[in-house]
Amino acid sequence: MLSDAATVAATRGRIMAVDFGDVRTGLAFSDPGRTLATGAGFIKPGGIAKAAEAVAAAAAERGAAAIVVGLPRNMDGTDGARADRCREFAGRVAVLSGLPVMMTDERLTTVAASRFLNATDVRGRERRKVIDSLSAEIILQDTLEKLAGIGRS
């Protein structure tokens, strides 16, 4: 079962973010104080089940207290084409990891990552190696800011 933001905000410690993809799944982790998101590379296992296993293992290895999975939304707020696959993936991660897993809107994260990589002149193979992790990092930093607001309310 997936968790809400209040449940994740109530946990203490490092948060993991995931940008689930069919080819690569980007990963990022926060510091224990939840102020800074840092990209942590990507995984390339095939399919939802293998990706969920790899993410649950990475969360355990890095000591994550909660996991955030990007939810692809259209600009009008409706679910994107991959939303159902991402929900299935997030549900599997929740079961396998035993951690609170929430989904968060990932609109424009890949666009923001692409713009950053364009501005820093990262191209070709190097770009493919970092874009998914950078997208997860953007998802996580946005989530950290939202969770900090919940903690102050």
Regions found by a protein language model. Give the residues of each.
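Phosphate- and other anionic-substrate recognition elements at nucleic-acid/protein interfaces
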Residues: M1-V18, V23-S153
